[in-house]
Amino acid sequence: WIMGHMVNAIEQVDEFLDLGANAIEFDVDFDDDGVAKYTHHGIPCDCGRLCTKYAVFTEYLDYVRQVTTPGDPKFRKELVLLALDLKLQRISSEKAYAAGVDVATKLLDHYWMRGWNGGRAYILLNIPLVEDYEFIRAFKDTLRKEGHEQYNAKVGINFTGNEDLDEIREVLEKLGEDEHIWQADGITSCFPRGTERLKKALEKRDTPGYKYISKVYAWTLVRSSIMRRSLRLGVDGVMSNYPDRVVKVLKEKEFSDKFRLATYADNPWEKFTPI
């Protein structure tokens, strides 16, 4: 999975897909009551990027629905995963539940269309800190109450704050979640980051019977040398401001027979097992 990073304006969706991304990550900004208002990062953000691009959240969902609905004139078959970077750290933890209800409802109304020809992409809920775990509970509660639990099959969870992996597992256990789990490791592209935690996450993913990590990705990678380093370790995905650089690295002899781009036929919730 090549995840385009900080794809917050509607016109950027096709721009990043044209560069080779098959997944996009966008920031979801909330008001003080936990209502998802905009796809917006704000200042500061990654080096060399404009931090202020944005869209109204519901309008953004309407657009990506079209891009991920077969038969729609805007359909792009390569876009298979949407990662929602939920800016919950900007609001009180007490509002995490309200935020979960709101995001689930807006996805039902504007993306899935409650079963009426909605978008087909997989959804990854990127949660910054384990203390905001009530968001997940609320999201699942809302799908159940609205009679649309079938969409759980399309939804995964990912804690992105580089917290202790065992702490993350404990929170997932508390929530009763042991599938559809991704693990991110990374830092803004402005700073270097070692591989210690990334290696631990990959080790857990590859431990037989370990349920709490099915995919691991590194973010936000801009240098080809760091992309190569991550691929050598065996990551499932790379988040980048420059998807075209990842595409180029994947074509190199060292990687071309080991990796390929994920398509809609690839299940993002299953551990990859080499044949």
Swiss-Prot record:
SS bonds (residue pairs): C45-C51, C47-C190
Binding site residues for Mg(2+): E25, D27, D85
Cellular compartments annotated: Secreted
GO molecular function: lyase activity; metal ion binding; phosphoric diester hydrolase activity; toxin activity
Tissue: Expressed by the venom gland.
Keywords: Cytolysis, Dermonecrotic toxin, Disulfide bond, Hemolysis, Lipid degradation, Lipid metabolism, Lyase, Magnesium, Metal-binding, Secreted, Toxin
Taxonomic classification: Eukaryota, Metazoa, Ecdysozoa, Arthropoda, Chelicerata
Catalytic activity: an N-(acyl)-sphingosylphosphocholine = an N-(acyl)-sphingosyl-1,3-cyclic phosphate + choline; an N-(acyl)-sphingosylphosphoethanolamine = an N-(acyl)-sphingosyl-1,3-cyclic phosphate + ethanolamine; a 1-acyl-sn-glycero-3-phosphocholine = a 1-acyl-sn-glycero-2,3-cyclic phosphate + choline; a 1-acyl-sn-glycero-3-phosphoethanolamine = a 1-acyl-sn-glycero-2,3-cyclic phosphate + ethanolamine
GO biological process, one term: lipid catabolic process
Example of a GO cellular component annotation carried by this entry: extracellular region
InterPro entries per UniProt: PLC-like_Pdiesterase_TIM-brl
Catalytic site: H5, H41 (nucleophile)
Cofactor: Mg(2+)
The protein's name: Dermonecrotic toxin SpeSicTox-betaIIA2ii
UniProt remark on cofactor binding: Binds 1 Mg(2+) ion per subunit.
Enzyme Commission (EC) number: 4.6.1.-
Record's function text: Dermonecrotic toxins cleave the phosphodiester linkage between the phosphate and headgroup of certain phospholipids (sphingolipid and lysolipid substrates), forming an alcohol (often choline) and a cyclic phosphate. This toxin acts on sphingomyelin (SM). It may also act on ceramide phosphoethanolamine (CPE), lysophosphatidylcholine (LPC) and lysophosphatidylethanolamine (LPE), but not on lysophosphatidylserine (LPS), and lysophosphatidylglycerol (LPG). It acts by transphosphatidylation, releasing exclusively cyclic phosphate products as second products.
Gene source species: Sicarius peruensis
SUPFAM superfamilies: PLC-like phosphodiesterases (SSF51695)
Family: Belongs to the arthropod phospholipase D family. Class II subfamily.
Residues making up the signal peptide according to the UniProt record: none
